[in-house]
Swiss-Prot record:
<dbReference type="InterPro" id="IPR011141">
    <property type="entry name" value="Polyketide_synthase_type-III"/>
</dbReference>
<comment type="function">
    <text>Polyketide synthase, which uses acetyl-CoA and two condensation reactions with malonyl-CoA to form triacetic acid lactone (also called methylpyrone), a precursor of phytoalexin. May participate in insect and pathogen resistance.</text>
</comment>
<protein>
    <recommendedName>
        <fullName>2-pyrone synthase</fullName>
        <ecNumber>2.3.1.-</ecNumber>
    </recommendedName>
</protein>
<dbReference type="InterPro" id="IPR018088">
    <property type="entry name" value="Chalcone/stilbene_synthase_AS"/>
</dbReference>
<dbReference type="InterPro" id="IPR001099">
    <property type="entry name" value="Chalcone/stilbene_synt_N"/>
</dbReference>
<feature type="binding site">
    <location>
        <position position="313"/>
    </location>
    <ligand>
        <name>acetoacetyl-CoA</name>
    </ligand>
</feature>
<dbReference type="GO" id="GO:0016747">
    <property type="term" value="F:acyltransferase activity, transferring groups other than amino-acyl groups"/>
</dbReference>
<feature type="binding site">
    <location>
        <position position="169"/>
    </location>
    <ligand>
        <name>acetoacetyl-CoA</name>
    </ligand>
</feature>
<feature type="binding site">
    <location>
        <position position="63"/>
    </location>
    <ligand>
        <name>acetoacetyl-CoA</name>
    </ligand>
</feature>
<keyword id="KW-0012">Acyltransferase</keyword>
<dbReference type="InterPro" id="IPR012328">
    <property type="entry name" value="Chalcone/stilbene_synt_C"/>
</dbReference>
<feature type="active site">
    <location>
        <position position="169"/>
    </location>
</feature>
<feature type="binding site">
    <location>
        <position position="274"/>
    </location>
    <ligand>
        <name>acetoacetyl-CoA</name>
    </ligand>
</feature>
<dbReference type="Pfam" id="PF02797">
    <property type="entry name" value="Chal_sti_synt_C"/>
</dbReference>
<comment type="similarity">
    <text>Belongs to the thiolase-like superfamily. Chalcone/stilbene synthases family.</text>
</comment>
<dbReference type="Pfam" id="PF00195">
    <property type="entry name" value="Chal_sti_synt_N"/>
</dbReference>
<feature type="binding site">
    <location>
        <position position="60"/>
    </location>
    <ligand>
        <name>acetoacetyl-CoA</name>
    </ligand>
</feature>
Length: 402
């Protein structure tokens, strides 16, 4: 029998590692076709739930909708589906089966739409995809949405899959953190990330004693985003968009009860403490310092920002606490306005918005003409995901076909 030393093992280990930072190589997004205007949603919501007799609550809900800074959202849950499943309109009535029937099939299908766009932009054969990370809040099932997507896309049956359920709004950062580890520690790997969210699991009829639920009805939207991530891009055929410099996750102190969601027979419940924006603001500067000080960055306005828009108040508080210029959160506010809170997919939509707007406005880099930026995701716990990104020169991106 042969023998081997620890040095031999280390050589094998090093040979399997990629060279360079994990890099975002393509982005695709998708939404359901059903678009609802926020200005009309209160009338629609109280009508389809047969709750128009709750006049005062309806007026309160209208004010909630007006304060969200959302113009429109895309929702997979249609009026026809609610008519076929009326228990979904009754507050907390047993209706989990109807919700599951919609999201178990809808989540991977919506994810496929985004993934096809990302793969098309990437430009390489889908057989080159080595890893799949799928994330969703809804539709827990086995085999899961990751398996369904492999079948829908015709990926290799040996693609290495990672399925994340019910991670909440921080998960857009979570998938980037996981993809960075996979890409940098598996030479030649190409990681497909898909975050697909259908919020029918959160839909409930109005109840005067549960205003948190009304906030959820006004805030969340449906959508999917897909990214291709890999280290050591082949510049002749691949077009880098952002490099993932570093990632971090932390639990904010004394925030256990700030944001909680529980899966019940009547769907997913939503509890949100009114001080969540202040909790985020209290901790955001420490998180920014931890992320950016290793790069010698202390001027928050010298970097681009991708902040999860958990709500308008969170963006306002972050902007105020860090003394950010008004345009620094423009991409976050735009995505909130045009799509609502897309849960895990939201910050990925923001990444796409930053690079597209940078190109359209003739900026020198994919990150608003700046070199570095920071992405924040906030979720139950409260958990904060932080990702530092480095932009790519637009001239180089254009030369490579972007």
């Amino acid at each position: 029998m042969g023998s081997y030393s620890s040095d031999d093992v280390e050589v094998i280990r090093e040979a399997g590692r990629a060279q360079g930072l994990a890099t975002i190589l393509a982005i695709g997004t998708a939404t359901p076709p059903n678009c609802v205007a926020q200005a009309d949603y209160a009338d629609y919501y109280f009508r389809v739930t047969k709750s128009e007799h709750m006049v005062d609550l309806k007026e309160k809900f209208k004010r909630i909708c007006e304060k969200t800074a959302i113009k429109k959202r895309y929702l997979a849950l249609t009026e026809d589906y609610l008519q076929e499943n009326p228990t979904m309109c009754e507050f907390m009535a047993p209706s989990l089966n109807a919700r599951q029937d919609l999201v178990v099939t809808g989540v991977p299908m919506l994810g496929k739409e985004a993934a096809v766009k990302a793969i098309d932009e990437w430009g390489l054969p889908k057989s080159k995809i080595t890893h799949l990370i799928f994330c969703t809040t809804a539709g827990v099932d086995m085999p899961g949405a990751d398996y369904q997507l492999v079948k829908l896309l015709g990926l290799s049956p040996s693609v290495k899959r990672y399925m994340l359920y019910q991670q909440g709004c921080a998960a857009g950062g979570t998938v980037l953190r996981l993809a960075k580890d996979l890409a940098e520690n598996n030479k030649g790997s190409r990681v497909l990330i898909v975050c697909s969210e259908i919020t029918a699991i959160l839909f409930h009829g109005p109840n005067e004693n549960h205003l948190d639920s009304l906030v959820a009805q006004a805030l969340f939207g449906d959508g999917a985003a897909a990214l291709i991530v890999g280290s050591g891009p082949h510049l002749a055929v691949e077009r880098p968009i952002f490099e993932i410099v570093s990632t971090d996750q932390t639990i904010l102190p004394d925030t256990e009860k700030a944001m909680k969601l529980h899966l019940r027979e009547g769907g997913l419940t939503f509890q949100l403490h009114r001080d969540v924006p202040l909790m985020v603001a209290k901790n955001i500067e420490n998180a920014a310092e931890k992320a950016l000080s290793p790069l010698g960055i202390t001027d928050w306005n010298s970097v681009f920002w991708m902040v999860h828009p958990g709500g308008r108040a969170i963006l306002d508080q972050v902007e105020r606490k860090l003394n950010l210029k008004e345009d620094k959160l423009r991409a976050s506010r735009h995505v909130l306005s045009e799509y609502g809170n897309l849960i895990s997919a939201c910050v990925l939509f923001i990444i796409d918005e930053v690079r597209k707007r940078s190109m359209a406005e003739g900026k020198s880099t994919t990150g608003e003409g700046l070199d570095c930026g920071v992405l924040f995701g906030f979720g139950p716990g409260m958990t904060v995901e932080t990702v530092v990104l480095r932009s790519v020169r637009v001239t180089a991106a254009v030369a490579n076909g972007n």
